[in-house]
Curated annotation (Swiss-Prot):
Positions bearing carbohydrate: 58, 334
Known role: May act as a carbohydrate transporter.
SUPFAM superfamilies: Cupredoxins
Propeptide position ranges: 346-370
Localisation: Cell membrane
Native organism: Arabidopsis thaliana (Mouse-ear cress)
Gene Ontology cellular component terms for the protein in this record: plasma membrane; side of membrane
Protein name from the UniProt record: Early nodulin-like protein 1
Cited CDD domains: OsENODL1_like (cd11019)
UniProt feature, compositional bias: Pro residues: 291-305
Tissue spec. comment: Mostly expressed in stems, leaves and flowers, and, to a lower extent, in seedlings, roots and seeds.
InterPro entries xref list: Cupredoxin, ENL_dom, Phytocyanin-like, Phytocyanin_dom
Main location (coarse class): membrane
Length: 370
């Protein structure tokens, strides 16, 4: 255990050393005038020498001069122009001075001896601005929409003949329910269902009236399994066929599944026949076809009607209306997945050196344990 701790400590020291080394490796030390001599008659004019070099932040200048008889002062531009030695920003007088250029912009240096300054012993150094590497533009990911999983719907119940309505012809005694809707996912219809009247049907023999249970809320753009052009009552209670002033169930306003341009369940991929008294599809658990709507236990289903034997005579009694269970049943909406936040990569020398140091440390540790 102690050997592992020693190895980890040694690796940390190596990492810190490499990070420090690489962080200061880019800094340069410049000898003023080429040889560092801070004198009145340099071999090359100080400003000419400065123009030939490129100074960056954290670089340094080395001044060498006679201690006690000369000095180096960092001053403002106005004091530089007038050789004012009484208001220095920094004053160096130890004979050998190293001045760090800790910012970008212009640095003004003059001799602390005013007579030397007036003879040209002054220097202007311009430090280049720090250039941050442009970061790559962050591309925000397109939010993906996860598909909703609709519940598997059972076939609608076999309908009973609608309540007696004023008609001009006798409704048939038997009717066959259309094929059950497919078990595929599709959006829920949200339009109210009303049974328009005075429309002729192309199905002369087998009209399928509304089922006994609440109208199935199938997740498909198809209309109700009943042969009416009404859409599935997803949010509003549908009117009973007893109130439809249509001529007869045979002449219901709906189109036949075989001839109607509407998206009838007869055109769905599923061809299993509907069985009587099977639970109707909905987003929530289906109720028994003989029981009333789950939200209105004391009222019958909105489309339940008497048997075919009572459809011969006109009736004025209306079937009590109850809201469809889909009004209170939450539907599955599209779920939007959160988008990951974009990452902006900024390259810095310290990060690169840290990675390199980590690699060196890992290699060293591996070699020690190997």
């Amino acid at each position: 255990m102690s050997a592992i701790m020693k190895s980890l400590c040694f690796s940390f020291l190596i990492l810190a050393s490499f990070a420090t080394f690489f962080s200061v490796a880019d800094a340069w030390r410049f000898n003023v005038g080429g040889n560092g001599a801070w004198v009145t008659n340099p071999q090359e004019n100080y400003n000419t020498w400065a123009e030939r070099n490129r100074f960056q932040v954290n670089d340094s200048l080395y001044f060498k001069y006679a201690k006690g008889s000369d000095s180096v002062q960092q001053v403002m531009k106005a004091d530089f122009d007038g050789c004012n030695v009484r208001n220095p920003i920094k004053n160096f007088e130890n004979g050998e001075s190293v001045v760090t250029l800790d910012r970008s912009g212009a640095f003004y240096f003059i001799s602390g001896n005013q007579d030397h300054c007036q003879k040209g012993q002054k220097l202007i150094v311009v430090v280049l601005a720090v250039r941050n590497q442009p970061s790559a533009p962050a591309h925000s990911p397109v939010p993906s929409v996860s598909p909703t999983q609709p519940p598997k719907s059972h076939s609608p119940v076999s309908p009973v003949a609608p309540a007696s309505a004023p008609s001009k012809s006798q409704p048939p005694r038997s009717s066959v329910s259309p094929a059950q809707p497919p078990k595929s996912s599709s959006p829920i219809s949200h339009t109210p269902a009303l049974s328009p009247s005075h429309a002729t049907s192309h199905s002369p023999a087998t009209p399928s009236p509304s089922p006994k249970s609440p109208s199935p809320v199938s997740h498909s753009p198809s209309h109700s399994p009943a042969h009416t052009p009404s859409h599935s009552p997803a949010h509003t209670p549908s009117h009973s066929p007893a109130h439809a002033p249509s001529h007869s169930p045979a002449h219901a306003p709906s189109h036949s599944p075989a001839h109607a341009p509407s998206h009838s369940p007869a055109h769905s991929p599923s061809h299993s026949p509907a069985t009587p008294k099977s639970p109707s599809p909905s987003s929530s658990p289906a109720q028994s076809p003989a029981t009333p709507s789950p939200m209105t236990p004391q009222s019958p289903s909105p489309v339940s009607s008497p048997s075919p034997d009572q459809s011969a005579a006109p009736s004025d009694q209306s079937t009590p209306l109850a809201p469809s269970p889909s009004e209170t049943t939450p539907t599955a909406d599209n779920i939007t997945a959160p988008a990951p936040s974009p990452r902006t990569n900024s390259a810095s020398g310290l990060a690169v050196t840290s990675v390199m140091s980590t690699l060196f440390s890992a290699t060293f540790t591996f070699l020690m344990f190997a």
